[in-house]
From Swiss-Prot:
The reaction produces a racemic mixture of D-glycero-alpha-D-manno-heptose 7-phosphate and D-glycero-beta-D-manno-heptose 7-phosphate. CDD domains: SIS_GmhA. The keyword Isomerase applies. Catalyzes the isomerization of sedoheptulose 7-phosphate in D-glycero-D-manno-heptose 7-phosphate. Pfam families: SIS_2 (PF13580). The gene is gmhA. Its EC number is 5.3.1.28. This is Phosphoheptose isomerase. Substrate binds at N49, G50, G51, E62, N91, D92, S117, T118, S119, S122, Q169. Pathway: Carbohydrate biosynthesis; D-glycero-D-manno-heptose 7-phosphate biosynthesis; D-glycero-alpha-D-manno-heptose 7-phosphate and D-glycero-beta-D-manno-heptose 7-phosphate from sedoheptulose 7-phosphate: step 1/1. InterPro entries: GmhA/DiaA, Phosphoheptose_Isoase, SIS_dom, SIS_dom_sf, SIS_GmhA/DiaA_subfam. It comes from Citrifermentans bemidjiense (strain ATCC BAA-1014 / DSM 16622 / JCM 12645 / Bem) (Geobacter bemidjiensis). One of its GO terms (biological process) is D-glycero-D-manno-heptose 7-phosphate biosynthetic process. It is found in: Cytoplasm. Binds 1 zinc ion per subunit.
């Protein structure tokens, strides 16, 4: 068992090393997109399925609540948290449209729409990102594996270089924490 524990920790460290190297410029670009949107009075909309939904909700909680700094709330919406909306849209339009209908309702040009998908192939996330771009939103996708079909529709795909879902999710939450930290610093420390 100890060998497996060490192997998993080694795999985690390899993902973190990749984030530090090849993904750092893309993370910086994501921070800039979010900061610019907030400075312009826009909002953040975030979505995912399963574990990615948990990450999306975590991201939104840090923006609306706070990450590290005592500051004003930042507008952000997790698109998977209202069960009545999800079940109504899912029943009437199909599961693939549960996020795109909400983007249609809530997103405005200049908003940042973030899709999270470990496989990069979640149809409901892809449809929502496509509609968001049509509406003039900025789009970020946190992906894994080879980025799947979503990498070609997101303005800024951040692909965690792993085929192992837990490692991809660890990469995603690390990216989310970095974005939250730097957005707060840019808006409430440097921006003063």
């Amino acid at each position: 068992m100890l060998v497996e524990i060490k192997a998993q920790l080694k795999a985690h460290c390899e993902v973190m090393t990749a984030l530090q190297g090849e993904l750092s410029p893309a993370i910086e670009s994501a921070v800039s997109l979010v900061v610019d949107a907030y400075k312009a009075g826009n909002k953040l909309l975030v979505m995912g399925n399963g574990g990615s939904a948990a990450d999306a909700q975590h991201f939104v909680a840090e923006m609306v609540g706070r990450f590290k700094l005592e500051r004003r709330a930042l507008p952000a919406i997790a698109l998977h948290t209202d069960t009545s909306i999800l079940t109504a849209i899912g029943n009437d339009y199909g599961f693939d449209r549960i996020f795109s209908r909400q983007v249609e309702a809530h997103a405005a040009a200049g908003d940042v729409v973030v899709g999270i998908s470990t496989s990069g192939n979640s149809p409901n996330v892809q449809l929502a990102l496509e509609l968001a771009r049509e509406k003039g939103c900025r789009t970020i996708a946190l992906l894994g594996k080879d980025g799947g079909s979503i990498k070609s529709v997101a303005e800024l795909p951040l692909i965690v270089p792993s085929n192992d879902t837990p490692r991809i999710q660890e990469g995603h939450i690390t990216i989310i924490h970095i974005i939250c930290d730097l957005v707060e610093r840019e808006l409430f420390v440097k921006g003063k």
